[in-house]
Amino acid sequence: MKKLSYLLMIVAIMIPFVVCSAQSTSQKSVNSPVVEVLYFHVPQRCKTCVALENAAKEVVNTRFANDVKSGKVKFKEIDLNTKDGEKIGDKYEVAWSSLIIVRKDGKKEKTANLTDDGFRYAVNNKVKIQGLIADKINEFLK
């Protein structure tokens, strides 16, 4: 009988620690920033536009595969000729093919426009633009 009493006492003491630990873990995942890689386009795309989209997708899906699975990193292709696409384009002040990386942390947003670098490097230096994209994603995940 004494053993059972001691066991129940130990369990009763441990319950608050387990509950607190579970709450702090779930709060960390809720408060983690989400990074969205937004590729904006119009229906007619040039060679450079296609190369930029492919480079960005490849970085997100290969280097950040685990973050994509967990929902921390997302790639979104946005057609500016749709109502939703136009609305999102207006929000980020985009009117043509562009690459915007967004860090969302609660109600706060921070953006980085990699369009100029994207058009500079997408065709002739894919490794360079992919490095810039990866660096910005890593920075925004912190």
Predicted regions: what they are:
Residues V42-C49, E53, T82, A122-K126, ...:
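Solvent-exposed, acidic/flexible segments
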Residues V68-D84:
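Thiol-based oxidoreductase modules, predominantly thioredoxin-like and allied folds used
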